[in-house]
């Protein structure tokens, strides 16, 4: 479903924990990280699409989160031709997004990246609100910056953004929460305990090749 200008209606999600850290998901079998997002289906409202995408990509339910804010209008980004299927080139230009800022009310172990048969992410982590966006695919960086900036006014304690962000860049994670590889996965009764394995990684390249986060 495209608008007259060739943009697909979409929702983006910035998910915060109690420390105002932001959820980042590593795209399946890639070395790029992004926020949950997805298209709005015909007949859906942006809020309905947001809750559906939230569950599909993170396993979280409406009771696990609270809506803090949303962008006033659509934010757009164009997709380079090399990422567009040949049959829709000339018609499809990119995405227009309504962004939601959510506060997570549940626990980390409520996050499950295998909530559907087609997961988007194979690892996830919390990171500070303001970080360099080097690990985000280039054509999405501007819209990420716009969404983070507009929604920062809803933070409980507004994050202070330095002119020159300091600290490690997004790809360099000291701790990445990840489950065991599928061939060694231990079945755990999640009604009793939430079990996670923390994989040490100084850079993305050092992460295990088959990492699935969540239950």
Curated annotation (Swiss-Prot):
Motif Nudix box location, chain numbering: 38-59
GO molecular function terms listed in the Swiss-Prot or TrEMBL record: pyrophosphatase activity
Occurrences of domain Nudix hydrolase (ranges): 6-149
Domain of life: Bacteria
EC number(s) reported in the record: 3.6.1.-
Keyword Mitochondrion: no
InterPro entries recorded: Nudix_hydrolase, NUDIX_hydrolase-like_dom_sf, NUDIX_hydrolase_CS, NUDIX_hydrolase_dom, RppH
Cofactor(s) recorded in Swiss-Prot or TrEMBL: a divalent metal cation
Keyword hit for Ion transport: no
Role: Accelerates the degradation of transcripts by removing pyrophosphate from the 5'-end of triphosphorylated RNA, leading to a more labile monophosphorylated state that can stimulate subsequent ribonuclease cleavage.
HAMAP family, A to Z: Nudix_RppH
Protein name (Swiss-Prot/TrEMBL): RNA pyrophosphohydrolase
Organism: Burkholderia multivorans (strain ATCC 17616 / 249)
Source taxonomy: Bacteria, Pseudomonadati, Pseudomonadota, Betaproteobacteria, Burkholderiales
């Amino acid at each position: 479903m495209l608008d007259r200008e060739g943009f697909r209606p979409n929702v983006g999600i910035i998910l915060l924990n109690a420390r105002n850290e932001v959820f980042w998901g590593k795209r399946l079998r890639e070395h790029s990280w992004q926020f949950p997002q997805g298209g709005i289906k015909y007949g859906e409202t942006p809020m309905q699409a947001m809750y559906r995408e939230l569950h599909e990509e993170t396993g979280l339910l409406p009771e696990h989160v609270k809506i803090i804010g949303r962008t006033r209008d659509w934010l757009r980004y164009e997709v380079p031709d090399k990422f567009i299927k040949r049959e829709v080139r000339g018609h499809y230009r990119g995405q227009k997004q309504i962004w939601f800022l959510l506060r997570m009310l549940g626990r980390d172990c409520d996050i499950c990246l295998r909530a559907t048969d087609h997961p988007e992410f194979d690892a996830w982590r919390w990171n500070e609100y303001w970080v360099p966006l080097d690990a985000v695919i280039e054509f999405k960086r501007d819209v990420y910056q716009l969404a983070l900036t507009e929604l920062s006014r809803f933070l409980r304690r507004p994050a202070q953004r330095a002119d020159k962000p300091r600290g490690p860049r997004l790809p360099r994670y000291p701790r990445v929460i990840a489950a065991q590889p599928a061939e060694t996965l231990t079945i755990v009764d999640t009604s009793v305990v939430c079990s996670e394995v923390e994989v040490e990684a100084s850079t993305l390249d050092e992460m295990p090749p088959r990492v699935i986060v969540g239950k």
